[in-house]
């Protein structure tokens, strides 16, 4: 009887915490930044493979068979998310934070403002491909050096990823077209 009540209360408390964590601004800056880190990690199948600690979840997430394929529209949506991220960071009052959290907040705000400034003012100013590095070589290096092939499933995932490289490069070519259009 007491076990059931304790379990119910624990489940309720955990549910409230998770809802708060993912629905809006968590109570703690540390929890918010940890959530953002995890969300960004899960958003990139390459990062999930690189880290490797979530490979046991691959049958569910299927991250080892996917590549990030960022379109121009995805970049716009990410930019809007970054602006929202900055607003949430700034909504944490320094008076409610510890000294360490204030420093962490300043670093996070600085980094986020740099991301926003870079997107708004220098989005198409880089050279993502050149003769010694870039997206084309990163794809090859990732597939040869990082993607694990320890089983038949991972070999099949490897082939699925290889088949997605063309679409990823096509989006990069669209980025170049937009860069040329802007001048």
What annotation goes with each model-predicted range?
Residues 6-183:
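Membrane-proximal, proline-rich intrinsically disordered regions
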């Amino acid at each position: 009887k007491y076990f059931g009540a304790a379990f119910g209360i624990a489940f309720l408390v955990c549910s409230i915490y998770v809802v708060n964590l993912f629905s809006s601004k968590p109570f703690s800056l540390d929890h918010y930044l940890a959530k953002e880190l995890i969300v960004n990690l899960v958003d990139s199948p390459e990062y999930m493979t690189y880290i490797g600690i979530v490979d046991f979840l691959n049958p569910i997430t299927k991250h080892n068979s996917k590549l990030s394929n960022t379109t121009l529209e995805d970049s716009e949506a990410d930019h809007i998310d970054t602006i929202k991220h900055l607003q949430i960071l700034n909504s944490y009052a320094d008076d409610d934070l510890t000294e360490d959290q204030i420093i962490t907040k300043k670093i996070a705000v600085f980094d986020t403002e740099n991301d926003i400034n870079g997107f708004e003012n220098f989005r198409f100013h880089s050279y993502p491909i050149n003769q010694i590095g870039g997206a084309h070589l990163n794809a090859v290096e990732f597939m040869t050096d990082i993607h694990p092939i320890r089983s038949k499933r991972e070999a099949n995932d490897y082939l699925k990823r290889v088949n997605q490289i063309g679409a990823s490069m096509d989006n990069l070519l669209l980025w170049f077209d937009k860069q040329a259009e802007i001048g």
